[in-house]
Amino acid sequence: MDKFKSMTELKELTKEGKDWEIECENRSSIVTILALHGGGIEPATTELAYTIAHCGDYNYFSFKGMRSKGNNELHVTSTHYDDQIALDLVRGSQRTVAIHGCEGNESVAYIGGSDDRLIELITESLEDIGISVREAPHHISGTQENNIVNITQTQGGVQLELTAQLRKELFKNRKSSRKNRENKDNWDDLMYDFADAMKKAIERA
């Protein structure tokens, strides 16, 4: 159960620059890449979303938990995600991909959302580089109409849930603490291969 029922409530009761920060790059693209629970909330999602967006010259949004501990309290579920910056980007996009993190000791990317064509293409593209992709279970399926990822101009997006193990593999030393995440020299080739695979899929959609 989330501590805050919306991003509006979260922002009223926490402090920007201390508890959290927002990174946003509007590149006037028809594609937006999101890390809604970035920074220390779901580690490695910010870094991967940033890399994908940079690779494809897409719009980018990340809400980053900055606390030394307790970042999980800053998690607001995607169906209650009323951050205006993120909403504006998604509503102006034809394709949106949200990068999330989930539990799991196995290296897996669970895929969901309502953009069936892009789901198919991303699955194929990620499997081509050796990533295990599975259909997301119901509780992380990302198919709800009011999930922010699905409020695009086409009423559909893609939600990718990466297990903790897969996210660790994005870093050379397999550690995802803030110091290790923010050191780009520690980013594994998989980070860039993943981003390139995503770009290839999006360009085919």
Q: Which residue stretches match the model-derived regions?
A:
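N-terminal catalytic or cofactor-binding beta/alpha core of small enzyme domains
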Residues: 1-205
